[in-house]
């Protein structure tokens, strides 16, 4: 977000030793308002950004960025909340084609949403919508705990820090097979691996 509240995406090259930072490509993705951004990587060259757009609408977009960062190409965008949102976006990738977004919506209520996005970023489809706090939810930060559990930290209506956990079993049922936990015995003799589905 620049001095005029316009939204920008930029790429930089940084060598392994961190000795320099070189600007490579840039894209002004929002010429009016592009605030409270949250950017995640969906796959090798597809990125997803959520932000507060003009008229305080909630918007999400996909972008193609090659590994060398030589270009930034907008693929598609979606206004997912047409009301007046406050922002405070926090988004994570939860599966190969799914992102989870938390944000402060209309009347400062707290929302969680999931979106289905194909590998090429050509479409954005809203799937799950949950209003998790009807009083106030600000300064959100969401993390993944395991394959279907997520933890959200935020400021509530009492100006206190709050943490909530969410279990999306419906979403987890459609996820690709993956390791959910790994436990090493005290004597390092065995490793117990638990998958997110039955293994035969």
Feature-to-residue mapping (PLM):
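Low-complexity, Pro/Thr/Ser/Gly/Ala-rich linker/spacer regions in secreted
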Residues: 168-186
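Extracellular, repeat-based ectodomains that mediate carbohydrate processing or recognition
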Residues: 1-172
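A short glycine/threonine-centered beta-strand motif
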Residues: 188-200
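Surface-exposed or flexible loop/turn and strand-edge residues in extracellular/cell-surface modules
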Residues: 24, 179, 188-190
């Amino acid at each position: 977000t620049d001095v005029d509240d316009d939204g920008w995406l930029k790429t930089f090259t940084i060598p392994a030793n961190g000795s320099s930072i070189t600007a490579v490509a840039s894209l002004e993705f929002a010429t009016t308002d592009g605030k409270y951004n949250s950017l995640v990587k969906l796959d090798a060259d597809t990125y997803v950004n959520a932000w507060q757009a003009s008229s305080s609408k909630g918007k999400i977009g996909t972008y193609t960025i090659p590994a060398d960062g030589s270009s930034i190409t907008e693929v598609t965008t979606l206004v997912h909340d047409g009301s007046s949102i406050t922002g405070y976006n926090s988004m994570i990738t939860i599966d190969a084609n799914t992102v989870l977004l938390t944000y402060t919506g209309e009347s400062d209520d707290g929302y969680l949403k999931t979106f289905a996005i194909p590998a090429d970023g050509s479409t954005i489809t809203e799937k799950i919508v949950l209003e998790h706090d009807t009083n106030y939810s600000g300064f959100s930060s969401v993390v993944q705990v395991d394959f279907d559990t997520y933890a959200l930290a935020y400021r509530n209506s009492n100006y206190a820090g709050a943490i909530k956990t969410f279990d999306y079993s419906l979403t987890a049922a459609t996820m690709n097979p993956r390791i959910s936990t790994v436990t090493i015995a005290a004597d390092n003799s065995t490793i117990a691996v638990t998958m997110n589905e039955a293994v035969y």
